Amino acid sequence: ASDVYKRQPLNLNALMSQYKTELNALIDNPAEPLDEIAEKWNYYLSGNVEPGRDRDVSPLIDAEFDQGGSWNNGIQNAIGFNGPSGCVAIAMCQLMHYWGYPEHGDGSTFYTENDYGYIEVDFEDAFYDFDNMAALYATSASQLLLFHAGVSVNMDYDWSGSGAMVVGSYPSAFYAMENFFGYHSDISFQWKDNHTDNEYRNIIKEELDNNRPIIAQGYGNSADSGHAWNIDGYEDDYFHCNWGWGGSSNGYFYFNNLNFSSS
């Protein structure tokens, strides 16, 4: 089991750790089920279960980008690093691959990376060739986009896991998508803590109903262990998660067990 755990995406490992924590808490402190859960049990135990779903959206994203191997050739060629490209960059790139946009970016940026020094990218002069950006294997086009996405969020490249911010002012994915990659200024992030579970669930479903996959952000037991991934479909209250590890462990996960902070 430990070997399987090591092969899982880091963001999924965080979810599994959350499952474990919640189960242990329930074992140690038995509690009455929430009304919503009790109703579901009553329904399934009634013997009158009918197949079918009221609402669902099949996975929208066909990209299965990965954090290692040849996917990182653009990063390696630029700065000599061929470790994990970072879940934030992957989530951004899979979203851009879905929309096939932009052909060119806006402006430029630079920063000094902790281990690899000064890095600069001119987004405006770049050509993002989505027609030659395969969904399941790395090409020079996807390698370039992954490198530029990482620089756009001032990626902290590290062999144990490369990190960057999803939301907030520069540098973040939220800022970069609008200011460097030309996405509409109406894009927004929603903090889960500002909504009831039902409200938040419906916000995500409405986006997916309108064929708009999202970037989700969540944290494990430590505030330092943040992760990003794409949510691109759902069946009832199970959401399809693309973890950004070459398709590994992509699947449907129950809403209440997804440890969101924003989307």
Regions found by a protein language model. Give the residues of each.
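Active-site nucleophilic cysteine motif
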Residues: G80-H97, A138-F147, M155-M177, S225
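Surface-exposed loop and adjacent secondary-structure segments within mature catalytic domains
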Residues: F65, E103-S169
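A recurrent domain-boundary module in secreted/ectodomain proteins
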Residues: N29, I37-Y44, G182, W245-S263
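Short, small-residue-biased leader/transition segments that mark boundaries at the very start
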Residues: A1-Y5
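Active-site nucleophile-adjacent alpha helix/oxyanion-hole segment immediately C-terminal to the catalytic cysteine
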Residues: N73-E124
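Extracellular zinc-dependent metalloprotease catalytic-domain scaffold
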Residues: L34-N82, A141
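Active-site-adjacent substructure of cysteine-protease-like catalytic cores
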Residues: Y175, N179-F239
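Solvent-exposed loop/turn segments at secondary-structure junctions
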Residues: Q94-H97, P102-E103, V151-V166, Y183, ...
